[in-house]
Swiss-Prot record:
Residues 1-20 form the signal peptide. Changing residue 94 to F: Leads to the transition from disordered structure to ordered structure and abolishes the function in cell death activation. Keywords: Host cell membrane, Host membrane, Membrane, Secreted, Signal, Virulence. A motif (RxLR-dEER) lies at residues 46-62. This is RxLR effector protein 207. The RxLR-dEER motif acts to carry the protein into the host cell cytoplasm through binding to cell surface phosphatidylinositol-3-phosphate. The keyword Membrane applies. Interacts with Nicotiana benthamiana ACD11, BPA1 (binding partner of ACD11), as well as BPA-like proteins BPL1, BPL2, BPL3 and BPL4. Secreted effector that activates ROS-mediated cell death in plant host and is essential for virulence. Plays a role in the transition from the biotrophic to necrotrophic stage. Associates with and promotes the degradation of Nicotiana benthamiana BPA1, BPL1, BPL2, and BPL4 to disrupt ACD11 stabilization in a 26S proteasome-dependent manner.
């Protein structure tokens, strides 16, 4: 398949190039009667702008800008199509959940150490939400985390509240 495509591209290139089918200089071709009135020498330049002085080749466009704009639009359309596809979104969600589970596992190992305090957690760049997940607290408790009555029933809740206030204080300082 690729050989056929390559052969097709090469043949189109040979037909389109300006010198592919030019007549040899000084050939003896007969002109028809209608062409005799407007006859030009065979070896004359055949370009539309042949009489103009040559300019900077970088200034000439020759259709490449249109092709480049079409290609950019096509690439942008494909990018949005791919990013909006359900497969890519599900893969991103799966990757995010796996990284979150890994991070929560690291925090759980950190919590099992004896000398864990809010400074150690902050130095390890633990976010309060990650700590909440690592402590395996009920999500409803997040609303009443500042109540000392709730701390008695949930021992990890007081640690979460202390760290959340410390984290808020440290992030507002920076």
């Amino acid at each position: 398949m690729s050989k056929v495509f390559l052969l097709l591209v090469l043949s189109v290139f040979a037909l389109v190039s300006c010198d592919a089918l030019s007549a040899p200089v000084g050939s003896k071709l007969s002109l028809s009667k209608t062409d005799e009135l407007n006859a030009q020498p065979i070896d004359a330049k055949r370009m539309l702008r042949a009489q103009e002085e040559p300019t900077n080749a970088a200034d000439e466009e020759r259709g490449m800008t249109e092709l480049a704009n079409k290609f950019k639009a096509w690439a942008a359309a494909i990018k949005t199509w791919v990013t909006n596809s359900k497969l890519v979104q599900s893969m991103n969600n799966k990757l995010a959940s796996l990284t979150q589970k890994g991070r929560v596992g690291q925090i759980e190992k950190l919590l099992k150490q004896d000398n864990v305090n809010v400074n150690v957690l902050y130095q390890n760049k633990v976010k309060p939400d990650e700590l909440f997940l690592a402590l395996k607290l009920d999500p409803k408790l997040k609303l009443i985390a500042d109540a000392p009555a709730a701390w008695a029933n949930n021992p990890g809740l007081s640690m979460f509240y202390q760290y959340a206030t410390y984290y808020a204080k440290m992030t507002t300082k920076a």
